[in-house]
Swiss-Prot record:
Cofactor binding description: Binds multiple chlorophylls. PSII binds additional chlorophylls, carotenoids and specific lipids.
Pfam families recorded: PSII
Primary location recorded for the protein, binned into one broad class: plastid
Membrane-spanning segments: 21-36, 101-115, 140-156, 203-218, 237-252, 457-472
UniProt keyword annotations, A-Z: Chlorophyll, Chloroplast, Chromophore, Membrane, Photosynthesis, Photosystem II, Plastid, Thylakoid, Transmembrane, Transmembrane helix
Protein's recorded name: Photosystem II CP47 reaction center protein
Family: Belongs to the PsbB/PsbC family. PsbB subfamily.
Highest taxon above the source species: Eukaryota
Signal peptide coordinates: none
GO MF entries: chlorophyll binding; electron transporter, transferring electrons within the cyclic electron transport pathway of photosynthesis activity
Assembly notes: PSII is composed of 1 copy each of membrane proteins PsbA, PsbB, PsbC, PsbD, PsbE, PsbF, PsbH, PsbI, PsbJ, PsbK, PsbL, PsbM, PsbT, PsbX, PsbY, PsbZ, Psb30/Ycf12, at least 3 peripheral proteins of the oxygen-evolving complex and a large number of cofactors. It forms dimeric complexes.
Localisation: Plastid, Chloroplast thylakoid membrane
Length: 508
């Protein structure tokens, strides 16, 4: 046929049977990838430390999505929360992966069948005997079925009525578990961090989809609207479908990057804004203050801070710190976290408590500056020692650890103090194993960053695809030079411009 690569899809343009076939094959590829990727991730995933080496540190991409929908157990006998299980049931991680692969195989066979048996009676217009599709009717069917699925997910799966529920956690990502969620019908349901809104919105959107589907099945579009929007053209379907997909991609890129109830930090890692705003640092200080108010010692108050909360307050878990083209998991960057060393408190020789100024997200290097509680600079690590006034040596800075592995240990040696001051720029201090994975010490992004980048990029590409195909279908007559209302027989090759009798070719 001699088609260029960018025109190959014209072979299914007027062939409904094979158009269906290639879409079934596409579903087979998507489902097969999902199942295969899940099995690969399960093969390399280490479930032994859900606190310091969670799935998002290990670069898992599909496991978090299974987990947020209620899958927590493996046929390997482990649970995502760190315990062991004896009877995980069929809907384990491996069970879901296997179901996708089986479904992929069935779709593969169905695609082959529809490719071979393309000339079905159902695709023929009984009046003309030519292949045609009743696109408004098909739209109604799909809208109705999508509405049923959407309603069913919200009313049964999320609520636990017939299903496991979804992953729900506290605002600091400490107590997450799969549980049933009741729909929230008030204004708070519009808060993106309220899980109840997920149930209520799916129920509402599903109901609307069912009603709209029934409407489009029972009411034919007016002729002028049908012609104006080119409802008989399959490229109209392509254009509007691309619009739906790119809109969804933009939305989920936002909910992933900025955070929401659908993207829990226990499964996808914290957001960059939680580092920028000192979100976990404030909660840690609040808990320590509460402990001191209960007459606990500083050491006891810091020892009560959960290691999980301290680990969130570390810049290496900020998804915006990883470079765009640094491949690999976070563990391949700064290493596997082994333990929290504790919280370092710095003091000068007058006994003032000093705070290390933290590194902003988009800095690779940052000066080491120690300020007092009023924000006055009291010490630093100078660039030029000859001109320094606030060096650790001159000010006599010491450091003492509270909580963690170094609880109660203090250092006055300037070199050691400076080492921990530098590390304090990056948040709480952790011991990191860089040997096991040969980690290079350069920060990586989390799956939160990858997902956002991928979906925002493809949404932009698909936006242009929507404009392209929408313009092609709306202005098809202009581009082709054929008046769609032309009743006269058009003989191709007679005119220089097809259908234009004023441009009759000169006989040779």
């Amino acid at each position: 046929m001699g088609l260029p690569w960018y025109r190959v899809h014209t072979v299914v343009l007027n062939d409904p049977g094979r158009l269906l076939s290639v879409h079934i094959m596409h579903t087979a590829l998507v489902s097969g990838w999902a199942g295969s990727m899940a099995l690969y991730e399960l093969a390399v995933f280490d479930p032994s430390d859900p606190v310091l080496d969670p799935m998002w540190r290990q670069g898992m991409f599909v496991i978090p999505f299974m987990t947020r929908l209620g899958i927590t157990n493996s046929w390997g006998g482990w649970s995502i929360s760190g315990g062991t299980v004896t009877n995980p049931g069929i809907w384990s991680y491996e069970g879901v992966a296997g179901a996708h692969i089986v479904f992929s195989g069935l779709c593969f066979l169905a695609a082959i069948w529809h490719w071979v048996y393309w000339d079905l009676e159902i695709f023929c217009d009984e009046r003309t005997g030519k292949p045609s599709l009743d696109l408004p009717k098909i739209f109604g069917i799909h809208l109705f079925l999508a509405g049923v699925a959407c309603f069913g997910f919200g009313a049964f799966h999320v609520t636990g009525l017939y299903g496991p529920g979804i992953w729900v956690s506290d605002p600091y990502g400490l107590t997450g578990k799969v549980q049933a969620v009741n729909p929230v019908w008030g204004a708070e349901g519009f808060d993106p961090f309220v899980p109840g809104g997920i149930a209520s919105h799916h129920i509402a959107a599903g109901t609307l989809g069912i009603l709209a589907g029934l409407f489009h099945l029972s009411v034919r579009p007016p002729q002028r609207l049908y012609k104006g929007l080119r409802m008989g053209n399959i490229e109209t379907v392509l254009s509007s479908s691309i619009a739906a997909v790119f809109f969804a991609a933009f939305v989920v890129a936002g909910t992933m990057w900025y955070g929401s109830a659908t993207t829990p930090i226990e499964l996808f890692g914290p957001t960059r804004y939680q580092w920028d705003q000192g979100y976990f640092q404030q909660e840690i200080y609040r808990r320590v203050s509460d402990g001191l108010a209960e007459n606990l010692s500083l050491s006891e108050a810091w020892s009560k801070i959960p290691e999980k909360l301290a680990f969130y307050d570390y810049i290496g878990n900020n998804p915006a710190k990883g470079g765009l083209f640094r491949a690999g998991s976070m563990d391949n960057g700064d290493g596997i976290a082994v333990g929290w060393l504790g919280h370092p408190i710095f003091r000068d020789k007058e006994g003032r408590e000093l705070f290390v100024r933290r590194m902003p997200t988009f800095f690779e290097t940052f000066p080491v500056v120690l300020v007092d509680e009023e924000g006055i600079v009291r010490a630093d690590v100078p660039f030029r020692r000859a001109e320094s006034k606030y060096s650790v040596e001159q000010v006599g800075v010491t450091v003492e650890f509270y909580g963690g592995e170094l609880n109660g240990v203090s250092y006055s040696d300037p070199a050691t103090v400076k080492k921990y001051a530098r590390r304090s720029q990056l948040g709480e201090i952790f011991e990191l194993d860089r040997a096991t994975l040969k980690s290079d010490g350069v920060f990586r992004s989390s799956p939160r960053g990858w997902f956002t980048f991928g979906h925002a990029t493809f949404a932009l590409l698909f936006f242009f695809g929507h404009i392209w195909h929408g313009a092609r279908t709306l202005f098809r007559d202009v581009f082709a030079g054929i008046d769609p209302d032309l009743d006269a027989q058009v003989e191709f090759g007679t005119f220089q411009k097809v259908g234009d009798p004023t441009t009759r070719r000169q006989p040779v």
